[in-house]
Amino acid sequence: MRNTELVQWFRQSTPYVNMHREKTFVIMLDGNAIAHPNFINITNDISLLHSLGIKLVIVFGARCQIDELLAKNQMSSTYHKHIRITDSKTLEVVKQAVGGLHYDIFSRLSLRLPNSPVLNVVSSNAVLAQPLGVIDGVDYGLSGKIRRINIEAIQQQLAQDAIVVIGPIAPSVTGEMFNLPFEEIATQIAIKLKADKLIGFCDQQGILDSEGNVLSDLHPREAKRYLTQFIESGQYHHSAARFLQAAIEACHAGIKRSHLLSYKEDGSLLQELFSRDGIGTQLSEESSENIRLATSFDIPGLLNLIRPLEEQGILVKRSREQLEMEISNYTIIERDGIVIACAALNHYPQEKMAEMACVAVHPDYRDSSRGDVLLEAIKRRAYKLQVEKLFVLTTRTTQWFQERGFVLSTTDDLPKEKREHYNYQRMSKILILDLGQ
């Protein structure tokens, strides 16, 4: 990364640093993620999150390590409904695998980065288990499910600035140990903690569409369709499918956002959390984008958006004072709290006309439909004001407006006040849309 790119990335990430501080994230790591060479980078990034004031719970699984140890001991496993049936001999292997991963995670997180403090990493026995029992005539043995979670104990550890690590085995009230699906543990802890995010590291960069492109945002309703595809194609064993199911459940239970990332790509955690569009798949009941009327708090974001366009001569220069006086005229699109598009509606009630002005879209989003979204929002505001004609003055985007029904006009068609202040040096094209009211 060149110095200029580093500076730009660091500046763009600053709002997210402030946004995430003091928030609680639950991170799911399966055995494949821990075994991968990139795991050391993942733990370094987790340490960085902790240094930024983020509260972290790590829940890990050990399926691939368990399978390797079973094969080494010439043992095999039986599954029913994607759950391992655990007998007493298998449980000994499970405990061995989980213990080894516990050590690996603690040792990696204990590696100090230069000029950084030693992390307080703790193991938690906050999960109490109970047997799954007999289902469909199948005895699951020592495979279990959650009976209770001592969420207060986890909260106390987080309050003491600790990273909490929890594995996939837990005791019962009778003292027996049970093998639990770690995705279930992570999901339920996130729900009971009222965590801000559930993050899963899986074997691909989120959820992919039919052409192999990453879906950056998914509503749980859409996510269910992809989960069904995983199941019907016999791919539920993939971590992406299991994590997707966990994310859907978490979203339905009130977790605002869940993220699916690849454990294979260096820096995926940081790119997902500290950039506008991320790198993996985000699940949310609500869109990360919001269109609304601007307030005075949006002025710094508006200035950042329109200043480059003013310097290029695309927009007329506006002072901060002018924006403050006219802020109620503006409609904005924000993404993760950052203004990425705007437009103003200046009303001329005597002529029943209005101007769509100061139309700006962030460069990263100009190939999308944000301009159309803004236009529709401005038209809705105009209808409420009983505006009959909407006009724009533009030097660069004449065709775009013509494609949407605007017709080239002259200064004679402008409201009197606007006509008197028309800038003949800029020679902006005048286009008018008949709203048919």
Curated annotation (Swiss-Prot):
Pathway: Amino-acid biosynthesis; L-arginine biosynthesis; N(2)-acetyl-L-ornithine from L-glutamate: step 1/4. The keyword Transferase applies. Disulfide bonds: none annotated. It catalyses: L-glutamate + acetyl-CoA = N-acetyl-L-glutamate + CoA + H(+). Coiled coil: none annotated. Its EC number is 2.3.1.1. One of its GO terms (cellular component) is cytoplasm. One of its GO terms (biological process) is L-arginine biosynthetic process. It comes from the Bacteria. It is found in: Cytoplasm. Keywords: Acyltransferase, Amino-acid biosynthesis, Arginine biosynthesis, Cytoplasm, Transferase. Pfam families: AA_kinase (PF00696), Acetyltransf_1 (PF00583). Gene3D superfamilies: 3.40.630.30, Acetylglutamate kinase-like. GO terms for molecular function: L-glutamate N-acetyltransferase activity. The keyword NAD does not apply. CDD domains: AAK_NAGS-ABP, NAT_SF. InterPro entries: AceGlu_kinase-like_sf, Acyl_CoA_acyltransferase, Asp/Glu/Uridylate_kinase, GNAT_dom, NAGS_kin, NH2A_AcTrfase. Belongs to the acetyltransferase family. ArgA subfamily. NCBIfam families: N-Ac-Glu-synth, PRK05279.1. PANTHER family: AMINO-ACID ACETYLTRANSFERASE, AMINO-ACID ACETYLTRANSFERASE NAGS1, CHLOROPLASTIC-RELATED. HAMAP family: N_acetyl_glu_synth (MF_01105). In bacteria which possess the bifunctional enzyme ornithine acetyltransferase/N-acetylglutamate synthase (ArgJ), ArgA fulfills an anaplerotic role. This is Amino-acid acetyltransferase. The lineage of its organism: Bacteria, Pseudomonadati, Pseudomonadota, Gammaproteobacteria, Pasteurellales.
